């Protein structure tokens, strides 16, 4: 009993058969290798645009793995096809095959070669990993906040970052205090802006459940974990616009938590916008946006509109509001809310109802909708913090929606 | 050289008592009945889970949400699809195969603990009821991975709690079954059958059972904490109160990665049996196949955090990459050994063999994509995308389910005493193979291009691929009905199978089909080599079995011929 | 009744022994899991116990642990005595063991109820000790039932699987507790 390791051929090899087998093995081997390489050439067409330094490395690693994997696939399937053709039992042939139990040499070969392949892959992957991760903090840093179901990107204005034509004493007092404070003044945008060639770091924080920050074109992804701050970095090498996608199941709107393209080809939701250089970045994004918060409109309704457009709060994912181009389909429609809010609950004015709906959304559910809206709290440090000043402005704006 | 003892002159082999449907619906400690109960129940849930998959693919025909009422309803679809397929289809189905076959392969009358065996099965019934009850209480919607805080604070229905209790019951069932298998295999092998003389399916079940007993308790721990957080106000996973969401991820995956080997190792065992018998050739590299199963079982405990490459501490990514790469080696050994088994054999294209060949071609793709996923820089791009969905279905459907199908076609005659129609089987295979490939292969591409998983809403440029995938999935769904029809036809009017229609050497075939209550007529003596095809003595043994236990209805041209001359003995 | 075991009985005994061993190997993993959870949670805090939280008592649980270890000794002594046809020694040893076991549960119940509440520190303590207590109680009750049966003469020197099985299960309770004791009170 036990393993019989003798190869027991039941036919004589034809003369010169040995060298013929070797030739066939060499041919098959070459076919495998070239086939694998051929398969690997499709790599660019199954990846999104290669827009970061990291992407180049990842794609090359993948191309190599696809070549190796493709070769192995060709080997296995090639042998299968050969076996099916050459060793099929002819009709009526019920004899057994030869009693071959194994071949130690062959088994060692097909243990050692895969081990070597796997070792090579490990080393190569390690090298790519070392070069794409960063250890030191980077200047160009943006804070991203994920919440159900939208992304907000927070930029900082410090006295050093003031737009060219602005000086500190031009600013109103509360705003000047914010700018000169240790943390600087924040403004937020639905889109992430940076410029080409500059390594960028994004710090990641979630307001509620776990999310994941993924930019396919950059080949980078990092989970947002409740209770922790994580970060990701990348270096764009192509100017352009790139979709940002949430890649961790976060609830009913998980699929909505990604950049989309609106009817007018406008970018909605989370996109990465890479400007060709810092000058363009400042001119087309940073300075206009900074100016909006440094010199906010007097009219609270206009201020409210500005806040909502800035996407510090994830309202756009769930609500329809034509004035702002919102097409969310999870929560009630907000068109004409300025009028309707007064009629929703007897005893509550429109103003009171709107404030309540934002501070305590579960109180008066609209029939047909579930209790999914986050509660926007008034105390700094609590989840989904919305200061009273913002709330006032937003409610003022919503009250103007009377079409 | 051992042979079956000759019957006394004039003694007739008693016909097996025909079992009725009602025998399978009540408590029984007979491992054969329990095995069928497991397999029938599992198959029911396969259809249920498959129906959920059809709904998912229907929704994904368009990039917007237009089939399900809202995102929550859609999330429930894939949560239950995965939970049911993993815990109520594959794991119990493999347990069913094990239950039916292991005592027979070892020449035993039953498992070591028959009463415990029955208990393990009947735990599945309330578990399944709880899963279904979840639909009436706000079904679980956080994916089968149930990451908190989505599965705790943000899942308000009770379905998630029912889900956790159901999985508790299934875990206990699994552990009890595994204990039974280990003791049976260790203590109840017949005289002369050392570990290295037992069938590879038994090795596979042994390795699987070792994983189950060591890993499932971690699932129990994770589920207990989840339930406490949901109903008892604890804060294990609530960071605002000092908890940590990564505790769940680590504990959950410490079980759930070995779980995938629980799902595939028995399939590997089935492959070895089917390939050897239907290619009429010994298994190539028996020892390597046996030991690689154990190696995979043990190494499988070292890789779990590769499911967490984008959420774990970055410094730990590389060690888990290393362990995940290493586990490819024993798996590769198996594939090459199976190719070696086929090489030089006499391949019969029975449905069982077709599905085994399908396994070999599709599982290798899953294995290759698995190695790619082990590479951290690449995984970071494709983690939580359809690339992963593709990989997991290649190994779980292209692997485990194909192996299950092969096993069904192979052992159906033994269990029922009837043959499954071979032409229907070939049709089933063709539809399944084509449907499977075009459902799942394009998912690699759409994932790499930027489609995340677990979404009903996606970027419009992916619609073409999604339509192809969905149409192929509908074909895959339809293919199941061919099998159902074939099974019904066989039970009502199938050809009588006889004891050993495939002329196999393992001990389950050395008795009538179906076997009598005590499995064997007299004391069974195993043939010296469960894979000893190609020898004169094997031929004589098989003739003996045919003579003693009867041949079924055979087609005219399938008359056995004597073994090759000079083929070694 | 004191005759040699038949082949079938020996086979059943071998199966039961292997089965119990595998079960224990499996079940200790839940305790290992809770240990791991404890370690991972405490790794998130600068100090353990966290700021402002009182440490667990040391004296009473250590006393209880000593009692538990002693009970294991007595349970084993009882089994050996039974095998040596020393029925009286068996019964007395188990009486003492049951008393010690009950004392352990009583002390730990007191600890469980009196520990001041904190979100993580006391909660993980209570989950771990509570989980262990369930096992100590269930297996303790099994011990008591077997003891009761033994007093009625149910077991002898050759046929006493219930005694052997519950002895081993009680060892399991003790080993599991030692793991928890080290994690909760020493490390």
Question: Where is each model-derived feature located?
Answer:
Chain A
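Non-transmembrane, membrane-proximal soluble domains of secreted or membrane proteins
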Residues: 3-20, 38-64, 77, 84-303, ...
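Alpha-helical transmembrane segments of integral membrane proteins, especially early/N-terminal helices
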Residues: 22-44, 71-78
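Aromatic- and Gly/Pro-enriched helix-to-coil junctions and flexible linker segments
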Residues: 61, 397-401
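Alpha-helical transmembrane segments of polytopic membrane proteins
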Residues: 66-70
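Detector for the c-type heme attachment site
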Residues: 250-251, 318-325, 339, 378, ...
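Axial heme c-ligation environment in periplasmic c-type cytochrome domains
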Residues: 314-317, 327-337, 359-391
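Conserved P-loop NTPase catalytic core
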Residues: 333-351
